[in-house]
């Protein structure tokens, strides 16, 4: 709590008046980070014309997020880093899982416009999601968004390959 109040430059009572528990504070952090990413994605999405571009906008929004200036350098997905600190089945961990599921659902929604086979849509959405999250983990370890750029190119290759069959 002392670290949080010092970083936020607020009195402890202000923190206690706004959050009834540490869990509630963590939930607010996760919700804020999720909304931050959704806003980045929405800005990218507004510039797209095709379903393929909309899917790649998900990768671009992750790239944008990685490019933010971080005090201690980029260390990967803040939500996954936070989730690693939570016990299994905690509300914070579940909130992070829901965010990741929503990102995959966004990809699947756009894939539905490209592919007719719903099982294929589900499989490719999972594949792209794993590619996205794995590249974010590597980017965090390396402190560079280079892996996200490579993942975007790989995603584009997957989409080109899949869409020529449909």
Language model segments and positions:
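Amphipathic alpha-helical segments used for helix-helix packing
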Residues: 69-91
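Cytochrome P450 catalytic-core helices
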Residues: 132
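C-terminal peripheral helix-coil segments that are non-catalytic and often amphipathic
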Residues: 64, 101-113, 117-122, 138-166
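Helix-turn-helix
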Residues: 1-28
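Short, basic, alpha-helical segments at the C-terminal edge of helix-turn-helix-like DNA-binding modules
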Residues: 31-38
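Hydrophobic alpha-helical connector segments
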Residues: 28, 42-71, 125-128
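Amphipathic alpha-helical packing segments from all-alpha helical-bundle domains
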Residues: 71, 89-113, 126
């Amino acid at each position: 709590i002392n670290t949080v109040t010092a970083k936020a430059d607020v009195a402890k009572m202000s923190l206690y008046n706004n959050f009834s528990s540490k869990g509630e504070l963590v939930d607010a952090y996760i919700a804020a980070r999720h909304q931050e990413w959704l806003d980045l994605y929405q800005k990218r999405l507004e510039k797209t014309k095709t379903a393929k571009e909309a899917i790649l906008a998900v990768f671009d929004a992750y790239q944008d997020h990685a490019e933010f200036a971080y005090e201690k350098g980029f260390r990967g997905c803040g939500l996954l880093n936070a989730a690693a600190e939570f016990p299994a089945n905690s509300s914070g961990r579940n909130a992070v899982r829901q965010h990741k599921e929503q990102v995959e659902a966004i990809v699947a929604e756009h894939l539905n416009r490209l592919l007719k086979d719903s099982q294929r849509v589900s499989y490719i959405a999972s594949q792209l999601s794993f590619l996205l999250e794995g590249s974010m983990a590597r980017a965090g370890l390396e402190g560079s968004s280079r892996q996200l750029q490579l993942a975007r190119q790989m995603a584009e290759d997957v989409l080109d390959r899949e869409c020529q069959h449909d």
